């Protein structure tokens, strides 16, 4: 099976290693000249994933036309705010064939439109089936070959099941789901909740308080799922893309969102911490859009609201933590 990965950040690079090690023919594309040079010359992404060798069988491209010529599937591994730009680059290359499955790995919301990643891609490529690959997968562990499980969601459930089986390997289990929207809601909101969890940890408020954040966070995820699609699927809420990814992102030292929050909690202010994080912090990028979506859906999202106002300088860190912990732990989690 030949696959193309568009985007050579930490996750895209780790995915190229994992898929190559399961016998896939892998191409990886990047518009970053430094990354391309590092991969070609040293077999390593020294910018985003230093210390991990990329198999020489992985073909590295900077030409979109060559990268997207004839793969069985394309995995889009760029930040949510760069997704539409990536689609425009693909369109300009005129190489994408109709019917080729597009697997979106972005976790976020497009700020300008409040659209989820699958909606952006489906709008740009109506002739291609769109899926979302998500779940608890730290890049360094994925690249190391440690056990990992993810979910592939899409409206075309039979194709999703086939792709999940084809992409799986001994250390990488991929299951399929028909809940395209629910999986994406969990993917974006868990990053925001992880920032809150990190703040609580950084302030030294204890594990009990962290548990409050995660439960309240699950309640907010459930509320958005219900408002968007009318129902929150139990298998999604307690599955890999929501509960699984939430727990990982809120607790793992390698989680950028939790680490960012912890730095904020320790520093007592948000400004300086952001300058210490050169890597993308997805929750920071998406929280304002998530608050705006909540308003449009007439929802109260206390964690999202507190984090957004804190990042915009409208709320101090201690006040944000107090609001988060005083938010009523909803009883909506009847799963």
Curated annotation (Swiss-Prot):
Q: Does the keyword DNA-binding apply?
A: no
Q: Which reaction does it catalyse?
A: sn-glycerol 3-phosphate + NAD(+) = dihydroxyacetone phosphate + NADH + H(+); sn-glycerol 3-phosphate + NADP(+) = dihydroxyacetone phosphate + NADPH + H(+)
Catalytic residues, chain numbering? 190 (proton acceptor)
Which pathway or pathways does this protein act in?
A: Membrane lipid metabolism; glycerophospholipid metabolism
Q: Which Pfam family, an example, fits this chain? A: NAD_Gly3P_dh_N
Protein residues bound to sn-glycerol 3-phosphate = 107, 135, 190, 245, 255-257
Its EC number is 1.1.1.94
Which annotated residues bind NADPH? Answer: 11, 31, 107, 139, 256, 280, 282
Q: What is its main location?
A: cytoplasm
Compartments reported by the entry: Cytoplasm
Q: Could you list this entry's UniProt keywords, alphabetically sorted.
A: Cytoplasm, Lipid biosynthesis, Lipid metabolism, NAD, NADP, Nucleotide-binding, Oxidoreductase, Phospholipid biosynthesis, Phospholipid metabolism
User: Which GO molecular function entries does the Swiss-Prot or TrEMBL record give?
Assistant: glycerol-3-phosphate dehydrogenase [NAD(P)+] activity; NAD binding
Question: In the UniProt record, does the keyword Cell membrane occur?
Answer: no
Please give the InterPro entries that the UniProt record associates with this protein. 6-PGluconate_DH-like_C_sf, 6PGD_dom2, G3P_DH_NAD-dep, G3P_DH_NAD-dep_C, G3P_DH_NAD-dep_N, NAD(P)-bd_dom_sf
As for what it does, the entry says:
Catalyzes the reduction of the glycolytic intermediate dihydroxyacetone phosphate (DHAP) to sn-glycerol 3-phosphate (G3P), the key precursor for phospholipid synthesis.
Q: Which family does it belong to?
A: Belongs to the NAD-dependent glycerol-3-phosphate dehydrogenase family.
Q: Which NCBIfam families match?
A: PRK00094.1-2, PRK00094.1-4
What name does UniProt use for this protein? Glycerol-3-phosphate dehydrogenase [NAD(P)+]
Source organism of the structure: Anaplasma marginale (strain St. Maries)
């Amino acid at each position: 099976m030949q696959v193309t990965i568009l985007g050579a950040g930490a996750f895209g690079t780790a995915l190229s290693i994992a898929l190559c090690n399961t016998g896939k023919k892998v191409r990886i594309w990047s518009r970053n000249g430094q990354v391309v040079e590092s991969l070609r010359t040293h077999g390593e992404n020294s910018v985003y994933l230093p210390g991990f060798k990329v198999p020489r069988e992985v073909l590295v491209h900077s030409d979109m036309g060559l990268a997207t010529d004839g793969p069985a599937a394309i995995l889009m591994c760029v930040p949510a705010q760069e997704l539409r730009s990536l689609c425009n680059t693909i369109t300009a290359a005129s190489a994408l064939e109709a019917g080729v499955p597009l697997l979106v790995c972005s976790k976020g919301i497009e700020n300008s439109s409040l659209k989820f990643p699958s909606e952006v891609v489906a709008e740009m490529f109506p002739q291609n089936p769109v899926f979302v690959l998500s779940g608890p997968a730290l890049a360094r562990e994925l690249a190391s070959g440690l056990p990992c499980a993810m979910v592939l969601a899409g409206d075309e459930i039979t194709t999703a099941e086939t792709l999940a089986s084809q992409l799986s390997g001994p250390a990488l289990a991929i299951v399929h789901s028909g809940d395209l929207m629910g999986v994406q809601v969990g993917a974006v909101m868990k990053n925001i909740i992880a920032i809150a969890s990190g703040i609580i940890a950084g302030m030294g408020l204890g594990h009990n308080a962290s548990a409050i954040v995660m439960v309240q966070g699950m309640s907010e995820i459930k509320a958005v799922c219900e408002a968007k699609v009318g129902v929150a699927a139990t298998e999604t809420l307690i599955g890999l893309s929501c509960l699984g990814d939430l727990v990982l992102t809120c607790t793992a030292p390698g989680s950028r969102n939790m680490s960012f929050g912890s730095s904020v909690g320790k520093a007592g202010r948000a400004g300086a911490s952001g300058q210490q994080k050169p890597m993308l912090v997805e929750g920071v990028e998406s929280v304002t859009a998530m608050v705006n979506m909540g308003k449009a859906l007439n929802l109260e999202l206390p964690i999202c609201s507190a984090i957004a106002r804190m990042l915009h300088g409208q709320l101090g860190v201690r006040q944000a933590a107090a609001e988060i912990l005083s938010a009523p732990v909803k009883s909506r989690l009847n799963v």
